[in-house]
């Protein structure tokens, strides 16, 4: 059965643990966290809030944390993330970790060395700066190097759309083994920009995307990798849209809780000058 999540990191003064309470109150069933919002400094607070919710963990990337697992000169930061996952992963209910192929001056041997230190399954995400064929080559190399630790691959729809265009953004689903597709990232984007917008704020044909992955029988993890743009409420509506497509019961649950909690949440956000 599909597990539907939402990316969480600090937002306008709200910590990850505060946002976790927010999405739990709305009935969200899963979240994806990252080092930008989850560290050794606040992990105990997050654990106290997570309850039975299942989480995934996005390993650091240069665009957010300023480094990734393929950089030898970032050993201290990388080891902190490894320690976080290995020591607290079970208490965080972590299912898997998401990794990008090497960026910039990154080295794939360093990436492999660091990934092997993690006590958690790994999925490899397609990115804009690699062609489908290059991504497949790296994926197959990691399958050899990591063995069963590499659980599968992740399809980031916006990344593929920006790289391959309107006609070919779904081609990767036929190039790599669909049975090994373990996670999908959804968000809207602008032309030439990986915007992480809510659905409808950019150029992606989200209805077509949802229809395609449902018709293919996809039944694993979907994460809305969406920032609060245009508004927090658009993020919630995007989550409801995915739930309505794949899990009607979850859609009804979130819709009902939104009707009850929206005035309370709105008042708290206004009090903190967030909206």
Regions found by a protein language model. Give the residues of each.
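Hydrophobic, well-structured mid-protein blocks that either form specific transmembrane helices
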Residues: 100-143
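Histidine-acidic metal/acid-base catalytic patches
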Residues: 1-5, 13-24, 78-86, 90, ...
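Structural motif corresponding to the early beta-alpha repeats
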Residues: 2, 29, 33-109, 159, ...
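Active-site beta-loop-alpha junctions enriched in small/polar residues
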Residues: 7-11, 34-38, 60-64, 102-104, ...
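Short, basic, helix/turn surface patches
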Residues: 54-66, 127-128, 152-154, 252
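Short, contiguous strand/loop micro-motifs
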Residues: 6-7, 68-72, 126, 196-197
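Conserved N-terminal beta1-alpha1 strand-loop-helix module at the mouth
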Residues: 6, 11-43
